[in-house]
């Protein structure tokens, strides 16, 4: 009987320590506490569906959505271990995250205070979902629509690695990726 009590007490203490460590880690990294209610990660139990917005004319699947007291926070996980210096976010990652903010706000009718981009080195970067960024998102969406009507779009970078990861590299006559 004493062994069972000691074992139970040890397990309760261990659980409390793990919970404390998890909360401390979340606070340290900038990940908000809240309920993860949507995941588009391989092998995860929560179902992720494509979010669509006819108002914005976009669709997508964020990696994760966290319900917090302030609203829903879209989270995007990136493989890159080297985010921009001084707390920045790459512009393409920022636009993607802003699009997820707009999708959640429009389709789910939920408040979205900000989004997060988490780089592989576990560096969490916050993307403010404010009026300035909404206007930028609207402008980028309009530019993409125009570009999609053009017979040819010119590559806008000199990065072979970016071409290697592109879904259109097989059809692209400007690809820097080695075949």
What are the residue ranges of the model-derived segments?
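N-terminal signal-anchor transmembrane alpha helix of single-pass membrane proteins
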Residues: 1-33
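Short flexible/disordered coil segments
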Residues: 2-3, 39-43, 172-179
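A short acidic/basic microdomain associated with nuclease active sites
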Residues: 34-55
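Metal-dependent nuclease catalytic regions and adjoining charged, substrate-binding loops involved
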Residues: 49, 53-55, 59, 67, ...
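Short coil/turn segments at secondary-structure boundaries
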Residues: 52, 88-91
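Conserved catalytic cores of phosphodiester-cleaving nucleases, focusing on short active-site segments
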Residues: 58-86, 96-102
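Short, solvent-exposed loop/turn segments at secondary-structure boundaries
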Residues: 86-89, 128-129
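Metal-dependent nuclease catalytic cores in nucleic-acid-processing enzymes
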Residues: 91-113
């Amino acid at each position: 009987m004493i062994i069972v009590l000691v074992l139970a007490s040890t397990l309760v203490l261990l659980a409390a320590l793990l919970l404390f460590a998890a909360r401390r880690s979340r606070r340290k990294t900038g990940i908000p506490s809240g309920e993860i209610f949507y995941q588009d990660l391989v092998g995860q139990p929560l179902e992720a569906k494509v979010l669509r917005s006819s108002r914005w004319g976009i669709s997508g699947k964020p990696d994760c959505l966290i319900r917090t007291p302030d609203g829903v926070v879209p989270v995007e996980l990136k493989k890159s271990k080297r985010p921009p210096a001084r707390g920045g976010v790459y512009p393409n990652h920022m636009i993607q995250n802003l699009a997820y903010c707009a999708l959640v706000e429009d389709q789910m009718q939920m408040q979205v205070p900000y989004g997060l981009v988490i780089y592989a080195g576990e560096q969490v970067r916050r993307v403010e979902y404010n009026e300035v960024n909404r206007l930028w998102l609207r402008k980028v969406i309009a530019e993409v629509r125009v570009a999609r009507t053009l017979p040819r779009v010119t590559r806008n970078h000199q990065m072979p690695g970016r071409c290697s990861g592109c879904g259109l590299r097989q059809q692209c006559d400007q690809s820097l990726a080695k075949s």
